[in-house]
Swiss-Prot record:
SUPFAM superfamilies: Phosphoglycerate mutase-like (SSF53254)
InterPro entries reported in the protein's UniProt record: His_Pase_superF_clade-1, His_PPase_superfam, LipoPS_heptP_Pase
Enzyme class, spelled out: hydrolase
GO annotation, cellular component aspect: periplasmic space
Alphabetized Pfam families for the sequence: His_Phos_1
Statement: the UniProt record of this protein carries the keyword Oxidoreductase: no
Function: Catalyzes the dephosphorylation of heptose(II) of the outer membrane lipopolysaccharide core.
GO molecular function: phosphatase activity
Protein name as catalogued: Lipopolysaccharide core heptose(II)-phosphate phosphatase
Main localization, broad class: periplasm
UniProt EC number: 3.1.3.-
Superkingdom, taxonomy of origin: Bacteria
Annotated family: Belongs to the phosphoglycerate mutase family. Ais subfamily.
Length: 200
């Protein structure tokens, strides 16, 4: 019972910290909460969260070539030239606050290309489990985090994965655009959704 109370207090303390950081972020140019009910976590807030514990950030891939009139980078199942530029811009902004992270993607051309342009040369590990978007993705996240418990993780995956996680963890309706993301963390073997990443 005592252990449970301590765990509960720790979780409440973390949630209060998250709310405070979100409120601080909300004093800037955007609201602290998205219309879907998820806390909005910008680059600076994410950097502060990462000082509390390692974070796991999941991004949808960049602009998909076969669903756009923009010029393709190469393979039609991959991303557009505009998508590469957007991914690189996002990566530069992200790395300014979190320079050290392990990088993963699902085994599709569009996620691999997005991660490659995002990272600007960082080692990428492709994991086919990140294409599966039920409870399997939680097992994959916990496994990746267990390999390097003190490292931040960036994962490039798909819109239906992000939609599933938001609904499952917070009963939120999340319809991610290209390169939209979610912020999570793993604590004592459980995966928690902290909020929606916003690039500001």
């Amino acid at each position: 019972m005592l252990a449970f109370c301590r765990s509960s207090l720790k979780s409440k303390k973390y949630f209060i910290i998250l709310l405070a950081l979100a409120a601080i972020a909300g004093l800037g140019t955007h609201a602290a909460w998205s219309s879907n009910g998820l806390p909005r976590i910008d680059n600076k807030t994410l950097g502060r969260l990462a000082q509390q514990h390692p974070v796991v950030v999941l991004f949808r891939h960049a602009e998909h070539c076969d669903r756009s009139t923009n010029q393709c980078l190469s393979d039609k199942t991959g991303i557009t030239v505009k998508g590469t530029q957007d991914a690189r811009e996002l990566g530069n902004a992200f790395s300014a606050d979190i320079p050290d992270f392990d990088l993963y993607s699902s085994n599709t051309v569009r996620t691999i290309q997005s991660a490659t342009w995002f990272s600007a040369g960082k080692k990428l590990t492709v994991d086919k489990r990140l294409l599966q978007c039920g409870n399997e993705i939680y097992s994959a996240i916990k496994d990746l985090q267990s390999k390097a418990p003190d490292k931040n993780i960036v994962i490039f995956t798909h819109n239906h994965c992000l939609t599933y996680i938001a609904k499952d963890k917070r009963d939120a309706t999340f319809k991610p655009d290209y390169l939209d993301g979610l912020v999570m963390h793993v604590e004592k073997g459980k995966v928690y959704l902290d909020g929606e990443f916003v690039n500001h």
